[in-house]
Every structure is written in C-alpha cells, then in structure tokens.
Amino acid sequence: ADLGWHGVDGDRRLAFRRLDDRSGFPWLTASKLPELVRFAPRRRGTADPGSLPTHVRTPEGEELTVFGKELATEVGRRHGSPVEMVHLNRGIFDEASISVITSSTVGEIGRLAAQRPDVRRFRPNILIASTRSIPFEEDEWVGGVLSFGEANESAAVCITNRDERCSMVSFDPDSARPDAEVLKAIVRVRDNQAGVYGAVTRRGRLTIGLPVFFEPAAADRRRQ
C-alpha cells in the first residue's frame, strides 16, 4: 500500500451519508449499524492498487457496484432510513490518519479477555510484530518516529498519541455480534487505550515484512 500525506491510499475515502440526519455528523458507522462490518470492498479489473474499490460484497455474498443505487438501497433498508455513498478525497478519521498496534498487544488483550480477538476489531492501518514482544509497547513510542524499510527515504510516521478505544472493538468482524469483554479488558488494564495514532512525515510504500525502526523523540534521546 502507498502511504501518502493523508494516510494509506484509499483508506476511509468512502462513507455512507444518512440523508435524513441533521446532527452535524451524518456518517453511518457500525456503532449505529453493526452489520456494516460484514460488508467487504472489492476491486474488479486491473485498477491501480490505491484506487477505490469498484464493488462491495454484502453479507449474503452479492457484489454490488460502489456507487450504484442497489447498494445504497440495501444498506438503507438495514439501517431503516435512506443513505448515499460519498467519496471523501482526504478521508474521515476519528483522531489521526494512521493507527498502529502490535501483535503482542492484541494477544495480551485477548488473554485478559479470555478470547482470541481478531486483529480486525482494532482496525489498525499498520500491525507490527515487535522483536521485543512486550504488550502495550506502543505507549513508549509517543513523540517518536517509526520508519518502514532500510532506505533513507522510506515511509515514516510520527506517533502522536495513544488510541482511545470505543465500542467498535466489541463487534466480531465476521458475525457482527457484540461482545463487551474485549473493551472491558482494555478499560480495566489500560484506561481504555490500546495502540497509537500517528501522522505521516515521509511518504512511501508499505509492504508486508518490512523492517520497522523506531527513533525516540529528541528530548528522550537527550536523556539517554
């Protein structure tokens, strides 16, 4: 995936807008319609990997065009009021355009919740398998920079703050069934925070298996 100034290319560039909503936040999210997590984007043909999906697969397996009337009608029927698909050039994010979590953190939360949670519950852009294998290691990265790959001009992300979790981690990504144990575990041991947010400081290409390097904040380097 290509990492640009506004995050991973294509990430959160599509959203359903509730046509009857006047709240100032018209977007339909899975917190309002949990079944949304079971809709999956698909890209047909030979489009560029960073381009928008061409279709969306419904929970029943039917593939509908992204901007077609059939998809909007189906989602609106489940929601109970009309919606339309909107293309957002820069995306819409909760806190920041990049979210990062380690596999050790996901595993520890699962242990605390007596489950094996799917990492998709946490919706990270970047999942890191740290050689330290320390749960919640990400907390130490705030203020520092992660770079991806060994080249001097490799992609880089400045870690800005910890990720405060919401009810989204409670939904099973395959069934959409809610289970509060994962969120309860995060609240109990980490003050409802797991993973970190970041901002892109250098654009580049991200691929599976890239080595990741951490550079602490300047103040931290002076203390070392």
Residue spans of the language-model regions?
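Electropositive, beta-rich accessory/interaction domains or terminal extensions
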Residues: 1-152, 156-171, 205, 211-224
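A conserved acidic, glycine/proline-rich C-terminal tail/linker
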Residues: 166-203
